[in-house]
Amino acid sequence: MSGVRAVRISIESACEKQVQEVGLDGTETYLQPLSMSQNLARLAQRIDFSQGSGSEEEEAAGAEGDAQDWAGAGSSADQDDEEGLVKFQPSLWPWDSVRNNLRSALTEMCVLYDVLSIVRDKKFMTLDPVSQDALPPKQNPQTLQLISKKKSLAGAAQILLKGAERLTKSVTENQENKLQRDFNSELLRLRQHWKLRKVGDKILGDLSYRSAGSLFPHHGTFEVIKNTDIDLDKKIPEDYCPLDVQIPSDLEGSAYIRVSIQKQAPDIGDLGTVNLFKRPLPKSKPGSPHWQTKLEAAQNVLLCKEIFAQLSREAVQIKSQIPHIVVKNQIISQPFPSLQLSISLCHSSNDKKSPKSATEKQSPEDHLYVLEHNLHLLIREFHKQTLSSIMMPHPASAPFGHKRMRLSGPQAFDKNEINSIQSSEGLLEKIIKQAKHIFLRSRTAATIDSLASRIEDPQIQAHWSNINDVYESSVKVLITSQGYEQICKSIQLQLNIGVEQIRVVHRDGRVITLSHEGQELQDFLLSQMSQHQVHAVQQLAKVMGWQVLSFSNHVGLGPVESIGNASAITVASPNGDYAISVRNGPESGSKIMVQFPRNQCKDLPKSDVLQDSKWNHLRGPFKEVQWNKMEGRNFVYKMELLMSALSPCLL
Amino acid sequence: MEAPPVTMMPVTGGTINMMEYLLQGSVLDHSLESLIHRLRGLCDNMEPETFVDHEMVFLLKGQQASPFVLRARRSLDRAGAPWHLRYLGQPEMGDKNRHALVRNCVDIATSENLTDFLMEMGFRMDHEFVARGHLFRKGIMKIVVYKIFRILVPGNTDNTEALSLSYLVELSVVAPAGQDMVSDDMRNFAEQLKPLVHLEKIDPKRLM
């Protein structure tokens, strides 16, 4: 409302009665005072609503009071009102204008209320200040400045706030993106090492060696999962990797193939599951991600399983004299009598710890790492073979298959030739052969070593070749006497150790084949050593100028040796006076006899026949030398001393 | 002289009746390289092989209307490989469930005097051609991509001329009869070659 002063309205007349007219005689005619209602109606008509007043409340209160006064006629008045509106009869009722005005005011108030409530939400409508020009010029410029400053500050603050909000949003997004990106880059790295494919919304990988030629039916699939169970707000641990792999439960943990050779075959009833002895999990290589080690371990388990499956299949299929036994996770075979080769698959899962394995510790020496390694090599060779055996047919229309197989018809192969195409040695056969060879080699080495340490006199030397085949290795055995290595080189043996037997090649080209039994080799070496002594005497005689009268490697006389034969030699001194006879047997040892000239024998009975002095040059009887009482550190040295003692002084 | 009787009984290879499942398509010369590239990725991991084959088609006409056809094929680039004699039966289109053309098939490896033998039997050479191309394998599926060359002078395989500007692509499996499952595998494989080549079962009767 404008600030115009309100007109005071009094509803009571100052005087009681109004003068209507003053007569000429000075008499006043009074108007009859208005009744209460008439007065009210008159006053009400005089209210000008378009002109506000300062005493609105008062007026409103009055009006209300009036309305209450008129409450009795309310209902009828309402009706009248309606009629009045309809009939357009103004002033039918004294409060008509008041009512109309109040009504319109109410309407406006309602509208104003609605508008305000809408404006308050700031959704559909906002209040904009009218341009400054509209303001009356008399506005205070300082206020204006203040308001404008306030406004611009508020605007700046809003811009800043918006910027901050955007920044926080982008920071959180970045963090999320970083994780996402890390996952993708990890996936890329994974992709470089492993075969992956997408199936539905999953990413599956291939652990199997199928692309390398494996025929193992295990699918070997692992699943690539996104590691999302980490809270973004918390600190990310060091080893956190956004990519994780889920491997099949049967490939978890670590596994290896254990090959061992035992001397005695245990009772089959005792055979049980081979216990694991624990191996520390392979440490992940620095720099390689955590999934790489996990997948490599799983792939190793898969390969071990494949090896074992292949071996057990062959063990059942192969017909051998002593059947191979497959019990639980163990394959038992007997390469040699009283020798047992056991191949077992040890698989430990990480979570399941068996307390038994800790107590029962296997001795590591019967654990053949070489064979285990070779098994891995063999299975890979096998894979390669299956890959390379797939040959493309030529001409192109021909069916797949081996070329020689297709040639068999046109070239009329016989059964043997066809069999030779098909036959291929299995993994088990190969590994048994290797085990036999390894066993034979170690037994040979043990035999030679024990002989060398037990027997001092002829010395035995073994020179093992460094480069061996898996099925063959060789050793050179030299038998010498200490101090006489240069002259006593008669016995040089080349031992070729194969799978089933040992071939011995002499220096002169003779070949002897020995079986796998260790005793045979030992007996052979013992007889060679005893022969060596006799050979040494022969060599020594040459050097000393003695004459060899007789020499025999195998003497048919004397006591029978249990091993081999005794050998003997007889040498005569340069002037022929003395003769030394040596008989050496592997078991009986050496027996040395010296023959003296006849004239030196005092106790010789005089013979009637040999009267002449010329017969004195005949040799006399033999006398045995007490060999163990001789000076000298070994046989050849003693012999040298004996020979020099019997030789005449040349000076 | 009376022509030898020609049996019209279905020819079977031994005890097992083998069938060839076949899908065919073709690519233009310029898109050969991308197809080869794709096949190398899809097929078994081995070095891709090329081949040059000489095929001769022999006919034996009897009283019946349709002659008996045998195909003799030899490799020109591999010495020592046996000749290949092949009988192919009438192709069956089959219904929609079978995704490949099926025909009876007998494969025999023979010695090199096959032509003389066939001539003696009364066969007559109908036509010959040289096929030159690439060979792939995926499991039991064989994929051959080759171009057919016309032989200008009969018998001289060095003097040839390309028949078309495109390569023939064949996806085939030889399996015992009734194993229609292989056709599903073939369909799946053909799907993977889709934008490069469309392998379909093509009824040769409709082309004639």
Curated annotation (Swiss-Prot), chain A:
Coiled-coil intervals: none
Disordered: region residues: 51-83
Keyword Phosphoprotein: no
GO molecular function: nuclear thyroid hormone receptor binding; transcription coactivator activity; transcription coregulator activity
Top-level division of the source organism's lineage: Eukaryota
Main location class: nucleus
Record-level GO BP terms: positive regulation of transcription initiation by RNA polymerase II; regulation of transcription by RNA polymerase II; somatic stem cell population maintenance
Keywords carried by this UniProt record: Activator, Nucleus, Transcription, Transcription regulation
Places the protein is found: Nucleus
GO CC annotation: core mediator complex; mediator complex
Bias kind Low complexity: ranges: 62-74
Pfam families: Med17
InterPro entries for this protein: Mediator_Med17
Family stated for the protein in its record: Belongs to the Mediator complex subunit 17 family.
Subunit structure: Component of the Mediator complex, which is composed of MED1, MED4, MED6, MED7, MED8, MED9, MED10, MED11, MED12, MED13, MED13L, MED14, MED15, MED16, MED17, MED18, MED19, MED20, MED21, MED22, MED23, MED24, MED25, MED26, MED27, MED29, MED30, MED31, CCNC, CDK8 and CDC2L6/CDK11. The MED12, MED13, CCNC and CDK8 subunits form a distinct module termed the CDK8 module. Mediator containing the CDK8 module is less active than Mediator lacking this module in supporting transcriptional activation.
Its biological purpose: Component of the Mediator complex, a coactivator involved in the regulated transcription of nearly all RNA polymerase II-dependent genes. Mediator functions as a bridge to convey information from gene-specific regulatory proteins to the basal RNA polymerase II transcription machinery. Mediator is recruited to promoters by direct interactions with regulatory proteins and serves as a scaffold for the assembly of a functional preinitiation complex with RNA polymerase II and the general transcription factors.
Listed name of the protein: Mediator of RNA polymerase II transcription subunit 17
Organism placement in taxonomy: Eukaryota, Metazoa, Chordata, Craniata, Vertebrata
Gene giving rise to this polypeptide: MED17
UniProtKB/Swiss-Prot annotation, chain B:
UniProt cross-references to Pfam families, sorted A to Z: Med18 (PF09637)
UniProtKB keywords: Activator, Nucleus, Phosphoprotein, Transcription, Transcription regulation
InterPro entries per the UniProt record, alphabetical: Mediator_Med18
GO molecular function: transcription coregulator activity
A biological-process GO annotation: positive regulation of transcription initiation by RNA polymerase II
Localization in the cell: Nucleus
Name of protein: Mediator of RNA polymerase II transcription subunit 18
Family as reported in the entry's similarity comment: Belongs to the Mediator complex subunit 18 family.
Keyword Methyltransferase: no
Function: Component of the Mediator complex, a coactivator involved in the regulated transcription of nearly all RNA polymerase II-dependent genes. Mediator functions as a bridge to convey information from gene-specific regulatory proteins to the basal RNA polymerase II transcription machinery. Mediator is recruited to promoters by direct interactions with regulatory proteins and serves as a scaffold for the assembly of a functional preinitiation complex with RNA polymerase II and the general transcription factors.
Assembly description: Component of the Mediator complex, which is composed of MED1, MED4, MED6, MED7, MED8, MED9, MED10, MED11, MED12, MED13, MED13L, MED14, MED15, MED16, MED17, MED18, MED19, MED20, MED21, MED22, MED23, MED24, MED25, MED26, MED27, MED29, MED30, MED31, CCNC, CDK8 and CDC2L6/CDK11. The MED12, MED13, CCNC and CDK8 subunits form a distinct module termed the CDK8 module. Mediator containing the CDK8 module is less active than Mediator lacking this module in supporting transcriptional activation.
Positions of modified residues (Phosphoserine): S66
Gene Ontology cellular component annotations, sorted alphabetically: core mediator complex; mediator complex
Species for this entry: Bos taurus
